[in-house]
A protein has these predicted regions:
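Alpha/beta-hydrolase superfamily serine-hydrolase fold, recognizing
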Residues: 1-194
């Protein structure tokens, strides 16, 4: 709805408020994570970077569900699944243009997390992808970058699924499986920190 950096700033201010009010809210500071799907996955990735850079209380995890972190879209899934699978590559390019109307935004790692020099020091990551999604390789490549930068990260790709299946809990059993898998992974991460 609003171009960069409005959504990023809103998310960061919200996270900062939660951290500052954790005692009043009876929240365990060691269990705060960030997550989102699609554009929300981009924001979650960017918030993880910004929280690290601004030395906010360390986040416990980042949940990235088919994130859009690479504006170039120069990868195989963007051409293989460009049309006919829900989200199209053409639509994705249009969304990027709306979010980043100024050229200087396109080189900012808080807008395009794949451009971050390194991801070291960001929280453990759970990266989710759908098989038939223009963004499958985006998620896969970001996971590889996390691992290369020594960030604990798991990658799960759901065969036969399309972008947006996270929101199909009453429609497909794979969405229910995804919810269970996410809970299992978050519990494993939080269990390691106790």
């Amino acid at each position: 709805e609003n171009p960069f950096p409005t959504a990023l700033d809103d998310c960061f201010e919200t996270l900062n408020w939660v951290v500052q009010n954790a005692n009043k809210l009876s929240i365990d500071l060691g269990a705060i994570g960030i997550g989102g799907d699609s554009a929300g996955g981009n924001l979650a990735s960017a918030i993880a970077l910004r929280a690290r850079d601004e030395k906010l209380t360390p986040l416990a995890f980042q949940l990235l569900i088919y994130p859009c972190n690479d504006i170039s879209m120069n990868y195989k899934s963007a051409s293989d699944y460009a049309e006919g699978y829900g989200l199209s590559t053409t639509a994705m390019k249009w969304f990027w243009q709306q979010y980043l109307p100024k050229e200087e935004f396109k080189s900012n790692p808080y807008a395009v997390p794949a451009l971050a020099r390194n991801l070291r020091g960001t929280p453990p990551a759970i990266v989710i992808a759908a098989e038939f999604d223009p963004l499958t390789d985006d998620a896969r490549n970001y996971h590889k970058k996390l691992i290369a930068d020594s960030v604990p990260a798991v990658y799960r790709e759901y065969p036969g699924q399309i972008h947006g299946f996270f929101n199909l809990g009453g429609v497909t059993d794979d969405a229910q499986t995804l919810y269970s898998d996410i809970a299992t992974e978050i519990n494993a991460i939080l269990g390691r920190h106790k």
